[in-house]
């Protein structure tokens, strides 16, 4: 289990525990870049193994919705579960979706997550272009509740 997955589990557990909710009605995850470290490992395996005898685990864990799915499995949440991956706008769309679900009465509570990581190669790209270097790891979870 990579750093981001561990951080995702920890922050979501803390948010659920703090709100006395065992199973959220919905899980909405936002990510700008997804699980880059696992994606890079998968691409390296493709090159190293010449596209043969690849392990499916890295591929399955490289998709953006892996984090939200893992949290749903752990919390036994079989309801609404979606991941937004629209770059810097991901959290905004996740919050709008959570607000919509609550306002329409479809759910009473929503676990909203923001997860991202920065690999050394992404940091070097950012540095070369003069952009701000993203944090190595970002894992935040919070609960929105209908009154």
Regions from the PLM with identified roles:
Residues 21, 34-147:
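Acyl-thioester C-C bond-transforming condensing/cleaving domain
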Residues 1-28, 32-39, 97:
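Conserved active-site "lid/cap" helical segment
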């Amino acid at each position: 289990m990579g750093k981001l997955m561990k951080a995702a589990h920890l922050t979501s557990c803390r948010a659920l525990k703090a709100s006395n909710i065992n199973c959220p009605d919905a899980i909405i995850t936002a990510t700008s870049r997804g699980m880059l470290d696992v994606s890079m490992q998968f691409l390296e395996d493709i090159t190293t193994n010449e596209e043969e005898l690849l392990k499916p685990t890295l591929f399955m864990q490289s998709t953006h919705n892996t984090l939200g799915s893992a949290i749903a499995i752990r919390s036994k949440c079989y309801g609404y579960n979606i991941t937004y991956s629209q770059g810097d706008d991901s959290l905004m769309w996740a919050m709008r979706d959570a607000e919509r679900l609550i306002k329409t009465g479809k759910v009473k509570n929503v676990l909203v997550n923001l997860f991202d990581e920065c690999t050394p190669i992404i940091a070097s790209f950012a540095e070369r272009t003069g952009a701000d270097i993203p944090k190595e790891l970002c894992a935040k979870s919070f609960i929105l509740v209908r009154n």
